[in-house]
Amino acid sequence: MNNRDNLHRFLFEEAKIRGELVQLDASWRAVLACHDYPAVVQSQLGQALAATILLSATIKFKGSLILQTQSEGPLQTLVAQATHHRTLRGLARWDGDVPHGSLSETYGSGRLALTIQTEGKNPYQGIVSLEGVNLAEALQTYFSRSEQLRTRLWLVADEQQAVGLFLQELPSQQGHKTDWERIALLASTVTTQEMLSLPSTELLYRLFNEEQVRLFEPEPVSFRCGCSRGRIEQTLAALGREEMESILKEQGIIEVDCEFCNRHYNFDRVDMEQLFTEQVKAPVTSTRH
């Protein structure tokens, strides 16, 4: 199977270990088309997006999973978001030249947060320090502290593709260290070139052909920002009429840019009048953009 932009889930039936492989192609390039990122920033954002798709597939929820880093170094912010529909979006902010190296060199001192926003429920967030050689190690630290399940990730990205491989023991498998070490050792033989060049099924066969692996149907992944004029209107309405009138008086127009996809929205006085006329008919509800 040569299709890209797919998430593949698989299970080691005799070892009770689950795995996932995601390959992002057109969806990743759609993210890059919105911003001009330096090569190192590209790589980190691509790895974060691959990881977010992988992690979102480990839980049952309706909503979004957000991976975010905040740091004091050159790469100041990464935001990668995936939904239960397997859509993604992401952005990065940086300052000056971003060195290629360990997390401390690229990010400086910082933290990594994973937030699960579920429809109708309060968000859940877990935070760890940005520690380790790379983003995969930082996420492994998160899992070791939060879920206490053996977990390994391999993440790579270039200007064309972002790829991630995920392994995790099932709760009932805890204590079977020999199985885990064998599977993890097989996976650790994978190379960056293989991850970026081999079709998914070929890559999995190359790594695990001696194991009993059940491969589930692939799930398509796509880029979707999710911003819309309607959502922006709800955000503006939440500011209130007085605040909007103040901005319009000063600037003549309200301009809003989506940081994820760079789409531009304009709102003038006519738009404001229409917005608040409609709000009389339908009370404002808080919506996160």
Curated annotation (Swiss-Prot):
GO BP: protein refolding
GO-annotated cellular components: cytoplasm
UniProt PTM: Under oxidizing conditions two disulfide bonds are formed involving the reactive cysteines. Under reducing conditions zinc is bound to the reactive cysteines and the protein is inactive.
Domain of life: Bacteria
Disulfide bridge map: 225-227, 258-261
Gene Ontology molecular-function annotations: protein folding chaperone; unfolded protein binding
Biological source species: Nitrosococcus oceani (strain ATCC 19707 / BCRC 17464 / JCM 30415 / NCIMB 11848 / C-107)
Family: Belongs to the HSP33 family.
The name this protein goes by in its record: 33 kDa chaperonin
Gene transcribed to yield this protein: hslO
Keywords: Chaperone, Cytoplasm, Disulfide bond, Redox-active center, Zinc
InterPro entries linked: Heat_shock_Hsp33, Heat_shock_Hsp33_C, Heat_shock_Hsp33_N, Hsp33_helix_hairpin_bin_dom_sf
Localization per record: Cytoplasm
